[in-house]
Structures are given as structure tokens and as C-alpha cells.
Design a protein with these regions (language model features):
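Acidic, histidine-bearing metal-coordination/catalytic regions of metal-dependent phosphoesterases
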Residues: 1-72, 77, 81-91, 117-125, ...
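The substrate-binding groove and active-site-proximal loops of carbohydrate-active enzymes
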Residues: 68-72, 99-105, 178-187, 219-222
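Active-site glycine-centered loops adjacent to acidic/histidine catalytic or metal-binding residues
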Residues: 70, 97-98, 130-131, 177, ...
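Conserved beta-strand->loop/alpha-helix structural units within folded catalytic cores of enzymes
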Residues: 96-99, 199, 210-213, 234
């Protein structure tokens, strides 16, 4: 009798799993009505730093660029045009993932349309995928068209070519990490060793790490223990670490202890958000500046001896936070 009960329970579990898979098919594997499309069907391909001529043109002593956190379809052509007018001097821009709400053709077209007519439409972009660029599933996957739209440098770890990479300028190294693609322990270790080497090899250059998920979560009820375990040691070599995902703004200074004769410089961790989606900031954390409910963007300037970072409100374009690091 017990054996029959066991078989009945197993059958119920299998049937329930089949029903759940059917109900959750779209959430896990994407909308069946939005199939993958060919390269010929993609209406726009962004300029990236995979192009040597683009990179050579920006080998100058002074650089300026814009950085946007999560967007989630919150910004339109008018917003981008205003950013273009306010900062005509920027030479490229960066985005931390979750530009769109879902990784479908419709949203990809919306993303491009939000840039038409602005100088962000014709400048190089440093892009990384966020969790909303990935198709959900038992194992999340990044649609192939993302790499076609953003043909990034192929200088990262073997399993993350085109999504984890670095870009060098005379006085700064920018490092992009695809955190949503980290599925296995070996992924974390491979990227962590690569990151440590990239930061060490940067020499006297300023170093900025850009990633979608934060090492130190800033939203209430959130934490990323695997991210912290994998990367917190390497990050002591970085000057600034930018992240998104938590839908608020928070800047904190992490002062590491000195090791032997080496004096440790602090690392600045910044969580930023350009979308209307908002989460409350964690309590009991010693932030230098923090708030929720106001979408922002960053304007960065790099000179031979100073890195300037300014944060502006996307509501009224007023300055909210700023700091600089000098060599």
C-alpha cells in the first residue's frame, strides 16, 4: 500500500511540474511569439570599442563620458536629447544593464528609438547585460542578438567573450563584468582571477569596474553573498565600482586595511539607477550619500591626475552628488 502511495505522490509531482513548466514557459524561456531574429533583421548596431579606429580616436589625455544605471524603458528620445544638449563634450557613454524590461525584439527596437536623433546614437557605448537582458530559465541565457547589437571587445574570460571585457585609455582602465552570466562556482572563480589580473595590470591608471549586480547590496532585503565572496578581495585594487540592479542611489567608501608595507587606498562603491523603478535604501549602513525615488545619471571626467564623478537628477538635471580622486 505504501508503495502505491509513493507512486501516486510521484505521479502528482510530475504532473504538477509539467503544469508549472507550461504555465511558466514564457517567464522561463521567453515569449514564444518573439523568436530569435537574424542579423539582417536587426535595425541598429551600436558603435563599441571592438573597433580599433574608435579606440585610437579616444587615446587622449582628457576624457568625458556619461554613465546610466538601470533604465527599464524609463527614458525616451526627449530625455536623451536633453542629455546630449547638456553634455555636448562627452566622447562615449556606458550603461550598466537592464536598459529594457524584457529581451524581446519589441523592447530592443524601443531601446534604439529612445536614442534616435541624439549624439548618444552615434557615439561608442560600453554596455553590459543585466538580468532583464537574459531569458529566464533553469539556466538563464543571453539571446544571441545582444552580442550582435553590442559587438564588444573579445578580451575577457573564455566563457564571457563579448560580455566581460576591458577598455584601456591613457589614464583609465574600464572593466565590464557580466554578473548575470555567473551560474557556476567555476564562473565566479574564473572571472574573479581575471578581474584581479586586469586591476593589477592597470598600473598607475585609474580603474573603474562596472557590473550590474552589486557586491554590497544597497536595497532593503537584498544581498549577493556569492558576488561578495568572489570579488570583494579583488576590488581592493579598484578605484571605483559602479553597479545597478537595486534601483536607488548609494555611495560608500570602503577603507581596506593596509597589507604589510603597502598603504591601501579606499575603494568607492556606487549603486546608481536611471529608472522610475525604486527600492528603499538599506538602513544602518554608513553611506557617504544615499536616497531612493530619484532617477539619476553620472557624468565622468578623466584627466592625467584626477577622476571627477558627478551625479545629476534626471528629474530636474540638478547636481546631487560629486567627488573626485586625485593621484
Amino acid at each position: 500500500m505504501r508503495r502505491w502511495i509513493g507512486w501516486i505522490l510521484l505521479a502528482c509531482l510530475l504532473a504538477g511540474g509539467a503544469i508549472l513548466c507550461t504555465v511558466r514557459w514564457e517567464a522561463w524561456f521567453g515569449n514564444p511569439a518573439e523568436p530569435e531574429w537574424t542579423d539582417e533583421e536587426i535595425s541598429h548596431q551600436f558603435i563599441t570599442f571592438d573597433n580599433d579606429s574608435v579606440l585610437r580616436a579616444l587615446q587622449r589625455d582628457t576624457l568625458s563620458f556619461l554613465l546610466l544605471g538601470d533604465i527599464h524603458n524609463s527614458l525616451n528620445n526627449k530625455d536623451m536629447k536633453l542629455l546630449s544638449d547638456l553634455h555636448p563634450d562627452v566622447q562615449f557613454w556606458a550603461q550598466l544593464g537592464d536598459w529594457m524590461e524584457r529581451p524581446y525584439h519589441y523592447y530592443e527596437q524601443m531601446m534604439y528609438q529612445s536614442l534616435v536623433g541624439t549624439h548618444l546614437d552615434s557615439l561608442p557605448v560600453l554596455a553590459i547585460p543585466g538580468n532583464h537582458e537574459y531569458l529566464k530559465g533553469v539556466v538563464k541565457t543571453l539571446p544571441a542578438h545582444w552580442k550582435t547589437i553590442f559587438p564588444n571587445p573579445q578580451n575577457g574570460p573564455a566563457r564571457f567573450l563579448g560580455t566581460t571585457y576591458f577598455v584601456d585609455f591613457p589614464h583609465i582602465r574600464l572593466i565590464a563584468i557580466d554578473t548575470d552570466g555567473l551560474h557556476r562556482v567555476s564562473d565566479y572563480t574564473q572571472v574573479a582571477f581575471w578581474l584581479k589580473k586586469m586591476l593589477h595590470d592597470a598600473g598607475d591608471k585609474f580603474t573603474i569596474v562596472m557590473m550590474h549586480h552589486p557586491i554590497y547590496s544597497t536595497a532593503k532585503g537584498r544581498s549577493n553573498p556569492f558576488m561578495w565572496l568572489a570579488f570583494q578581495s579583488a576590488m581592493r585594487e579598484a578605484d571605483v565600482v559602479f553597479s545597478g540592479h537595486d534601483h536607488n542611489y548609494a555611495r560608500r567608501t570602503k577603507q581596506y586595511k593596509a597589507r604589510f608595507w603597502k598603504k591601501e587606498e579606499p575603494t568607492i562603491f556606487i549603486g546608481t539607477n536611471a529608472s522610475r523603478k525604486k527600492y528603499e535604501v538599506k538602513d544602518n549602513v554608513n553611506y557617504d550619500c544615499s536616497f531612493s525615488g530619484r532617477p539619476v545619471y553620472e557624468y565622468l571626467q578623466v584627466t592625467p591626475d584626477t577622476l571627477y564623478i558627478s551625479t545629476y537628477s534626471l528629474d530636474d538635471m540638478n547636481l546631487i552628488d560629486e567627488f573626485f580622486i586625485s593621484r
